[in-house]
């Protein structure tokens, strides 16, 4: 499979299908035992669901690994987009859960901050593994909508178990037992009686039952 520049991809599958393993292969954290991965990108960044919080300021956290000299205005703009406006006045406040002087944020707020760091990244390829796991469905939809605008010229791979969140992606990759079994846009995959359609219908039925 080839990732094309400027396209947005979704990677889905049940738990244990191999999504996170594939992510770590793409980031060169694992080495393939068979086959090859050809990497033509100069800069990559990733946001995993188990992101870390470090004893640094909000500004330092947002610009971690970012060599560009971003203005406070740009940082504030992204924080506004992700409903983190309350942090704009405290960019130099220590961000940590380990000290009394730190800024105490909820898990959802911390996840928004981690997403903001990805939004500010200058990388060519951005991988996001369950980036909205701590957000409600409405907030999740908004994050994916914003990502289409912010990542216009970048290649992105969103890994999620919530299929509704990736229905607007350019292409969706479906893993099953460690194998890429289907790929295509949402409409194409729904026309097939395959893994994706069954997963999507199951999730839709579960959502209706909860309502």
What is each residue range found by the language model?
Residues 102, 120-124, 153:
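A short, proline-enriched helix->beta-strand linker immediately N-terminal to the Walker B motif
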Residues 54, 84-113, 131, 206-211:
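ABC-fold ATPase nucleotide-binding domain signature/coupling loops
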Residues 149-158, 166:
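Conserved catalytic loops of ABC-family nucleotide-binding domains
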Residues 12-14:
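The feature captures the beta-strand-to-loop junction immediately N-terminal to the Walker
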Residues 27:
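Helix-to-loop junction immediately C-terminal to a conserved catalytic motif
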Residues 126-130:
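Catalytic Walker B motif of ABC-type/P-loop ATPase nucleotide-binding domains
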Residues 145, 167-211:
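C-terminal portion of ABC ATPase nucleotide-binding domains
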Residues 51-99, 122, 195:
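Conserved "ABC signature" C-loop
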